Amino acid sequence: MLLRKSIPYIKICRDISASVRNNKEIAQKLPLSVPLPMENNSKSIEKGCPPMGRNSRVTRLPNGLKVCTEDTYGDFVTVGVAIESGCRYENGFPFGISRIVEKLAYNSSESFSSRDEVFAKLEENSGIVDCQSTRDTMMYAASCHRDGVDSVIHVLSDTIWKPIFDEQSLEQAKLTVSYENQDLPNRIEAIEILLTDWIHQAAFQNNTIGYPKFGNNSMDKIRVSDVYGFLSRAHTPQRMVVGGVGVGHDEFVSIISRHFDLNKSTWTTQPTVLPAKIPEIDESRAQYTGGELRLDTDLTKLTIGKPYPLLSHVVLGLEGCSYKDEDFVAFCVLQSLLGGGGAFSAGGPGKGMYARMYTELMNRHHWIYSAIAHNHSYSDSGVFTVTASSPPENINDALILLVHQILQLQQGVEPTELARARTQLRSHLMMNLEVRPVLFEDMVRQVLGHGDRKQPEEYAEKIEKVTNSDIIRVTERLLASKPSLVGYGDIKKLKDLRSLDQAVAKRDLKYLFN
């Protein structure tokens, strides 16, 4: 049977080989700019036809849990759970509790007495697992062989709904988080992580997205009962999406229905593990405030024994939009247009080198070590940032250049530059989704945020429709907000927030000059 099915493909391969042999002499004489004289018998897909290989399905279980899948080829799959959790929901709980939950993942549970047992079960199915918390999402994910989906889902459901914590495991998690908090400032490659955390604190002061993810000092207050209390509020079916890439939908739904039963969760079967009073999850809308966070620090220790100059860092933030906003795609194109990165770009020329942060900042000012734009979007708000690193004596000049980059966008952009930014963004989107774990994360995040799965072709079409007037409109939207400012390192020469606010409000750089 298998042989009969393969005969047509063998014939096709033979025809291709014969065509190549017949045209070999011609091909050797033709320049690379001339197409080979070979017939292409493949039929193009008509416009409006459903894209090949897109078979996403979403099912909502009676308990409110959403299950989504997208089948793919191959022997290995990626499965996992996305939860509306993270530091933005820590109001009322000790700050840092979401990172403690992250470190406690895949420890002992009702079915597994130790972490060793968990990983022994994973090894049986060639499985690897991970748990990562962001500002608004907790992600438990695993990759394994197709035959091991049921066993791996068992591991995931146990670590999410049936964990067993004790004082020893909690203390170990606290030590791990404390070490990371102390280690991050000592690693030059971690500066971007810290700057991102700080600009959120400055932009959304003391609320939701602005709660700190790193460097908090309240972990000593966290008790075992607090962890269970947080899980009982955040790990509810209505706040969760279970996803699988490379699995059959109906069978996967059946597996999830067996393993994800809230009535069997640790805090339901053993209510004594909960504290006497559990705060409600903070569902308030993010409030962009604007603000300033200055960390005047000696960073000389980061350069000792390393080929890095002594740098200071500045971040300018302006109010962006949520991923549900009509301007979300336009903001993404704007970020692609500005682009940026470090002075050395691994991978060689062509990797974003035509973006403005390269052409107008790093290529013209040798003292700028890095410059990059980011668009951080959440369910209800966002912050658009531009970051630069330079020697301390040039840090205010770097801020002036960043503001200038935003101000000049009011004049619009050239058609070729905009087309390049759109093409690069589409390419980035499509190429990333070729990686199975990335496809999984994209799928579960969309179902978690939108309730359904939007295909990348939909976004590609929206990207292509972004015009010059859209760029001008979202630029004006940025400039209408109060700025946020973060300075890190030797920032004595960096202007204050009041001067920056005047420069943005009056569209005039003179307020930033000494």
From Swiss-Prot:
Subcellular location, record wording: Mitochondrion matrix
Transit peptide, start-end: 1-55
Gene3D superfamilies: Metalloenzyme, LuxS/M16 peptidase-like
Matching Pfam families: Peptidase_M16, Peptidase_M16_C
GO cellular component annotations of the record: mitochondrial processing peptidase complex; mitochondrion
A GO biological-process term: protein processing involved in protein targeting to mitochondrion
Subunit (UniProt): Heterodimer of mppa-1 (alpha) and mppb-1 (beta) subunits, forming the mitochondrial processing protease (MPP) in which mppa-1 is involved in substrate recognition and binding and mppb-1 is the catalytic subunit.
Keywords tagged on the record: Mitochondrion, Transit peptide
InterPro entries in the cross-refs: Metalloenz_LuxS/M16, MPP/UQCRC_Complex, Pept_M16_N, Peptidase_M16_C
Family to which this protein belongs: Belongs to the peptidase M16 family.
Organism lineage: Eukaryota, Metazoa, Ecdysozoa, Nematoda, Chromadorea
Function: Substrate recognition and binding subunit of the essential mitochondrial processing protease (MPP), which cleaves the mitochondrial sequence off newly imported precursors proteins.
Protein name: Mitochondrial-processing peptidase subunit alpha
Gene symbol of the encoding locus: mppa-1
GO function term, MF aspect, one: metal ion binding
Principal localisation: mitochondrion
Knockout mutant characteristics: RNAi-mediated knockdown causes 63 percent embryonic lethality. Embryonic lethality is further increased in simultaneous RNAi-mediated knockdown of mppa-1 and mppb-1 or ucr-1 and mppa-1.
SUPFAM superfamilies for this protein: LuxS/MPP-like metallohydrolase
